[in-house]
A protein has these predicted regions:
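Catalytic core of membrane glycerolipid acyltransferases/transacylases, capturing the structured
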Residues: 1-12, 36-38, 42-105
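A short, well-structured juxtamembrane/interface segment
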Residues: 15-42, 56
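Short amphipathic alpha-helical segments and helix-helix/interface helices
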Residues: 13-18, 58, 82-83, 120-121, ...
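A cross-family acyltransferase "interaction/gating" segment
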Residues: 77-97, 124-218
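Short, flexible/disordered intra-domain loops and linkers
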Residues: 1, 101-111, 145-152, 220
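A Trp-anchored, charged/polar loop motif used as the substrate-binding/catalytic surface
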Residues: 108-122
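Accessory terminal regions of nucleic-acid processing enzymes
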Residues: 216-235
């Protein structure tokens, strides 16, 4: 199947990481409450610093979790090979209208929500890991300063996508997983990683309990729920 082919490709990458590149020390810590398996259904959040992060999640997850997918923009389907791969592998692809378009036609917002719901529900026919980079973009000191983020090593989280996924999938997932990736010797570029210039990578995995009030809320239209959800994510 397409997923087996993809996992074989990831397996080759992992073999290269383990046997060809200069040794990288992996320090992986997993919450005892996390019972990860290849048949599970997981929603996962992760900090985002480098393109290497995706390779790290693949390296970690190959024998522990189903193939990691993430929300992608529908427009990417028109990029040769990349877009087709996302589609074939069942990545949830979303059409999003601009704020200007929604202002002219508010019904488009609910059309976008319906598209997202269908994309998430499509995942439920199989084991999955759905990854959400809460920051929405890679962390840099410049972006942190511009945002005036209160967090030392994180940008302000964009919680809307997580709220949507939890409300659609929350009662049917086996765990909500928080992954933290740390590069103690400095954040590497993708080329640096494949040149073996990353001495150590730290990965911490923990289970996040989902409060009952989270499921069934309306992040878009309920200001009280939105504020409470944002505070939960910040904490």
């Amino acid at each position: 199947t397409n997923i087996q082919i993809t996992n074989s490709w990831i397996g080759v990458n992992n073999w290269l990481i383990d046997h060809v590149l200069p040794e990288t020390k992996w320090d992986i810590s997993i919450d005892p409450e996390l019972d990860l398996n290849m048949q599970g259904r997981y929603l996962m959040s992760c900090n985002h610093q480098s393109w290497v992060d995706t390779t790290v999640t693949q390296y970690f997850g190959l024998t522990r979790m189903p193939l990691t997918r993430f929300f992608t923009k529908w427009e990417l389907i028109f990029i040769p090979f990349v877009g087709q791969a996302f589609k074939i592998l069942g990545f949830p692809m979303m059409k999003r209208h601009s704020k200007e378009q929604i202002a002219q036609n508010p019904a488009l917002k609910y059309q976008d929500m319906d598209e997202a719901r269908k994309a998430c529900e499509h995942l439920l026919s199989q084991p999955f890991t759905l990854l959400n980079y809460l920051e929405g973009t890679r962390f840099t000191a410049e972006k942190k300063a511009k945002q005036q983020s209160p967090f030392q090593n994180l940008l302000k989280p964009k919680a809307g996508g997580l709220a949507l996924a939890l409300n659609i999938l929350g009662q049917q997932i086996d765990a909500f997983v928080d992954m933290t990736i740390v590069y103690p010797d400095g954040v590497p570029g993708y080329g640096e990683f494949w040149l073996g210039e990353v001495p150590r990578i730290v990965v911490d995995m923990r289970k996040i309990n989902i409060p009952d009030w989270v499921i069934g809320g309306d992040y878009e239209d309920d200001a009280e729920y939105r504020e409470k959800f944002q505070q939960w994510v910040d904490d």
